[in-house]
């Protein structure tokens, strides 16, 4: 991820009155990889080329324009990841545009709802590749908004947790609510409304570290080590931040343990999992949406022990998703939505969880985690003052 625009992020934030204002307007604090700071850097380092630039597209709107044979709009989903669009009215925010670069409002396509039609396909594709001249196109979106659709989580209450090197939480939102701490991001939901994306850097990175340290395989990680300890781990916690974490933004210089005693393999395995998902629960509370069901995906989702801890921490059913290429599937579903298809019908065909793999929360364990959560938050807060 490009982090070369930290100076530009600071300049944009200063110009509008601080990162709190940037976040309240755009859904995210000024982020180095987002389009706005990148445009500002381009305008500063090569002002002549910027002045000669007629139109600035995202990759999504650029390719949509190629298919339509004309400049088309940037959708609300991808447009929200630019630090330029106002979440309240879903239009370019003039304060952010002025803070970013001169005459930027003249260089951007308009914003539009994600399922807007962009017209018939270009004659080029009809003549060269045999597309039907009656083929309609819709504007494109980004990979994360399309994944939300493809995973069947476009309605508030359905939460997706993707377990990878970094763990990511996706959720639809009925209203544009922003993270008061600035860790999470808010984008437009392609099916209408809004969506959140919260990334936790130390995902499988931390789980792998514990597995290797105690010379476990994934089977023993689940069946042996995890079964040795009760929910709550008898008070033994850890912050598994092997790399500087981004949610919350803290560098602890490595993992931090709540106790000086030597952790057994069972204690360490449970500590890393409980801490990861208690941290996830803590830093998704601002969404204001209680999950009714959680879908998990990614390699670690196949591990029943990990899935059960998620179910117990959040207190809801957990399903495994079987949607390979969810962004691609979601893009196809978006095209169908643009042509008038019903979302629920599309989800029933393309976004179903694996049969017979649902895990239900254990009420006693969930109550234990409700009692542990304040202690975990206090343990985490100590690291910001130490």
What do the predicted segments below correspond to?
Residues 74-77:
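N-terminal entrance/gating region of PLP-dependent enzymes' catalytic architecture
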Residues 101-113:
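A conserved helix-loop-beta module that forms one wall/lid of the active-site cleft
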């Amino acid at each position: 991820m490009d982090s070369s625009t930290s100076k530009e992020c600071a300049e944009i934030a200063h110009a509008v009155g601080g990162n709190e204002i940037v976040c309240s307007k755009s859904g995210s604090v000024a982020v180095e990889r987002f389009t706005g700071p990148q445009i500002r850097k381009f305008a500063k380092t090569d002002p002549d080329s910027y002045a000669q630039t007629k139109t600035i597209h995202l990759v999504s709107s650029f390719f949509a324009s190629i298919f339509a044979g004309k400049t088309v709009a940037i959708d609300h989903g991808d447009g929200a990841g630019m630090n330029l669009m106002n979440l309240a009215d879903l239009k370019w925010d003039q304060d952010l545009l002025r803070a970013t670069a001169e005459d930027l409002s003249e260089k951007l396509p308009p914003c539009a709802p994600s399922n807007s039609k962009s017209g018939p396909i270009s004659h080029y594709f009809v003549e060269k590749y045999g597309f039907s001249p009656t083929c309609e196109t819709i504007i494109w979106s980004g990979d994360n908004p399309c994944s939300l659709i493809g995973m069947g989580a476009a309605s508030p209450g359905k939460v997706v947790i993707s377990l990878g090197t970094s763990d990511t939480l996706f959720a639809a939102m009925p209203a544009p609510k922003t993270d008061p701490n600035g860790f999470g991001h808010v984008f437009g939901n392609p099916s209408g409304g809004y969506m959140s994306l919260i990334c936790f850097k130390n995902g499988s990175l931390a789980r792998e570290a514990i597995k290797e340290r105690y010379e476990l395989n994934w089977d023993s990680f689940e069946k042996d080590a995890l079964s040795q300890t009760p929910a709550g781990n008898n008070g033994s916690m850890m912050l598994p931040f092997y790399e500087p974490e981004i949610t919350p933004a803290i560098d602890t210089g490595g993992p931090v343990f709540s106790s000086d005693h030597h952790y057994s393999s069972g204690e360490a395995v449970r500590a890393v999992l409980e801490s990861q998902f208690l941290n996830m629960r803590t830093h998704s509370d601002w969404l204001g949406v209680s999950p009714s069901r959680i879908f998990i995906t990614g390699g670690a989702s196949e591990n029943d022990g990990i899935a059960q801890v998620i179910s117990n921490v959040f207190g809801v059913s957990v399903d495994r998703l079987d949607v390979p290429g969810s962004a691609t599937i979601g893009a196809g579903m978006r095209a169908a939505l643009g042509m008038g298809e019903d979302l629920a019908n599309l989800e029933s065909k393309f976004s179903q969880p694996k049969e017979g793999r649902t895990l239900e929360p254990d009420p006693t364990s969930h109550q234990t985690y409700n009692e542990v959560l304040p202690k975990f938050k206090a343990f985490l807060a100590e690291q910001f003052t130490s």
